[in-house]
UniProtKB/Swiss-Prot annotation:
Source organism (scientific name): Pectobacterium carotovorum subsp. carotovorum (strain PC1)
Role summary: The RecF protein is involved in DNA metabolism; it is required for DNA replication and normal SOS inducibility. RecF binds preferentially to single-stranded, linear DNA. It also seems to bind ATP.
Annotated ATP binding sites: 30-37
Subcellular location field: Cytoplasm
Gene Ontology molecular functions: ATP binding; single-stranded DNA binding
Record keywords: ATP-binding, Cytoplasm, DNA damage, DNA repair, DNA replication, DNA-binding, Nucleotide-binding, SOS response
Protein's recorded name: DNA replication and repair protein RecF
Amino acid sequence: MALTRLLIKDFRNIEAADLALVPGFNFLVGANGSGKTSVLEAIYTLGHGRAFRSIQAGRVIRHDQPEFVLHGRIDGTETERSVGLSKNRQGDSKVRIDGSDGHKVAELAQLLPIQLITPEGFTLLNGGPKFRRAFLDWGCFHNEPGFFAAWSNMKRLLRQRNAALRQVSHYGQLRAWDQELVPLAERISEWRAQYSAAIANDIATTCTQFLPEFSLSFSFQRGWDKESEYAELLERQFERDRMLGYTALGPHKADFRIRASGVAVEDMLSRGQLKLLMCALRLAQGEFLTRQNGLRCLYLIDDFASELDSTRRRLLAERLKATHAQVFVSAVSAEQIEDMVGEKGKMFRVEQGKITVQSQD
């Protein structure tokens, strides 16, 4: 699977661009602020319905324009698909797939699985549990057909339950919500646990290649006491939840922890080592998807050289090459990506939102 063509209109500082892409490495080289990250963000937005640097649509639409428009052509193993997304300043989205309107953003995500590696990506390791839940949920979304519907319903029921907690006086008034919430919560927790167990070997293998000096362990925490039934816990915790005004325990509090020799990795590893670990997690997840479903991820790597010395850059370059996936890499200079440049690569020069093809000679 590869994105063979990308059209960008009024996205960030890019007025218009029509890019012919290659299945291997696509390099975006330019000074800071030139727009190279905007290209990566456009691809990410086409696959997720939102940008990774801002959740507000108005901030990614070019100045004085009413909307942004993105189109892509995806070359799969047997078919070619066309996808499109537009979003106005009010946040209203239109999704088009193969020429027809009325599709959902989740359908884009299914067609265009993306792994993102940015300088801010350390939050996967040292940020709050929501970032690691998102990591697990990405995997469940692509491996369990019913996950997205169950996850969406669970989020809706939790919002309704939290609103009701501020109004009710006894648990019986919440029972109807919990009768729907509990089976969804248990199913989602089971899917997450199964996925974290299934991918653990992939993560361990990749981490051994990247960080052989550490003995890493992984553990999934479902968000409530593993000895307790969730239905009983919700009833038992009612008074506490009512005082708090929200549901304190459940799958929305799940986490996936990584330790090095028993110590949280964020407390032991250097920033360069944390970046390698983050890359290892993303690569392992992408390779697991390929093995399970035959789909290859797109890898988006912003500011490739950040936090990595030349030895670590070469290591990451070799591992990315081994995936045979499509990779998009941004860098300030061509020298920073010389270990990746090869006959299957294509280089783009980005200057003030203008994108041109640059010879690699």
